[in-house]
Amino acid sequence: GPMGWVPVFYRF
C-alpha cells in the first residue's frame, strides 16, 4: 500500500 515502512499485514 501507500505505507512502505509498516508490516505487510498493515499495508492497505
Swiss-Prot record:
Keyword Heme recorded: no
Q: List the disulfide bonds.
A: none
* Expression sites by tissue: Expressed by the venom duct.
Q: Where in the cell is it found?
A: Secreted
Listed transmembrane segments? none
Q: What are the UniProt keywords, alphabetically?
A: Amidation, G-protein coupled receptor impairing toxin, Neurotoxin, Secreted, Toxin
Task: Give any Gene Ontology cellular component.
Answer: extracellular region
Q: Does the keyword Secreted apply?
A: yes
Q: Which residue positions does Phenylalanine amide occur at?
A: 12
Q: Which superkingdom does the taxonomy of this entry point to?
A: Eukaryota
Using the record for this protein, list the coiled-coil segments as residue ranges, or answer none.
none
Q: Where is this chain primarily localised?
A: secreted
Any one Gene Ontology molecular-function term assigned to this protein's record: toxin activity
Family according to the record: Belongs to the FARP (FMRFamide related peptide) family.
Q: What else is known?
A: The mature peptide does not contain cysteine residue.
- Write out the function statement from the record: This peptide activates mouse sensory neuron-specific G-protein coupled receptors MRGPRX1, but not human receptors. In vivo, causes hyperactivity in mice when injected intracranially.
Q: What is this protein called?
A: Conorfamide-Sr1
